[in-house]
Amino acid sequence: MEEAPAIGAVPVTDTPAVAARTHAENTAFLVIAAVSLCHLINDVMQSLLAAIYPMLKRDYGLDFWQIGLLTMTFQGTASLLQPMIGLYADKRPMPYSLPVGMGSTFVGLMVLAFASDYLLLVAGAALIGIGSAIFHPEASRVARLASGGRYGLAQSLFQVGGNFGSALGPLLAAFIVVPRGQASVAWFSVIAFIGMAILWQVGSWYARYQARATQRPKATRTVTVARHKIVIALVVLAILTFSKNVYMASISSFYTFYVIDRFGVSVQVSQVMLFVFLGSAAAGTILGGPVGDRIGAKAVIWVSILGAVPFTLALPYASLEWTIVLSAVIGLVMASAFPAIVVLAQELVPGRVGMVAGIFFGLAFGTAGIAAALLGVVADAKDIAYVYWLCSFLPLLGLLTILLPNLKRGEAAA
């Protein structure tokens, strides 16, 4: 595989000399493409769980709180383990943990395919969560190492693989799993093996990179942000991640039920509508990172979270046609925030790439999982439409973006 410049394994400074070495041609796009493709594969398998919720609800007689518990098990497991794995890998990099994570997701998928009761469904969801916890921090680190200094672009390309994977899941469920039944989930084992093979090669590149990195002199970033401002900024970024992911969880877990209940569409049509939302989110992810490289992460966060407010407020009152349009706009706008959030957090805490990625990916999974469970309880107590009215106010938390520092290239935290 193509080899990346020495970026991201340790804190570095963006001096003019370094900037001169980090032109686009030095960005290891082959490596970034590989981890992005595997992110797609990983998240296709993950999204199949949520995509077959209507089928599982029908076949197992589940309540909404049980649907929410499946999401909480998957995302809660991932959220608890990711920061710990990221912190450990900052000290002891684990290049070959990537195919292991994919293997755990594969096993979880097989358990889901042949589960005969609800407890086995929960076990399958937990194994998928463990796979995500192993995959995301190290894969995010590899994308940064291969970025050639274009951190926002690399983070977007990495994350968009996951977004496209999440978008493909409902379509695959609609046209393969729903017509053929739960056992057909096992067919996707083929792409899991492909992913494991690719990640083994990525792990080999990563190991060679780490071997060279130990021989280089370490550089440090210039201290320009006070520590108390770092704490405030990280708390704000966590709150913004919470607001974004709770709203996104309301869509990914319950959108199909919402459109079926309100507009009387079929399960397959509801899956296609979910694909429209998730596909738009993938497009937003592509835009967020490169735009952040040009205009700054803070500006992207302003637009992506607070800018979604008019559309989320309008969604509960929209017709079927406008629901499709509004959900697409919401997905496009809100999804552009996360690459910028991760990059800004990594700039604030230099030298802790894996830990920061683990915390924010873990926070994203955890808040979404807890939200899915709680929103399921609300949906049982009230109705699905009430859930979307309640969640429509969450993007107003984007006003907290005003508290974030204005970092320029070459600046970092203490």
Model feature map: region roles:
Residues G61, P93, F114-L119, G148, ...:
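Helix-breaking motifs and short loop linkers at transmembrane-helix boundaries and internal kinks
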Residues G124-G161:
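Cytoplasmic helix-loop-helix junction between adjacent transmembrane helices
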Residues F158-A207:
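Helix-loop-helix hairpin linking two adjacent transmembrane segments in secondary transporters
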Residues G292-I341:
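C-terminal transmembrane helical hairpin of 12-TM major facilitator-type secondary transporters
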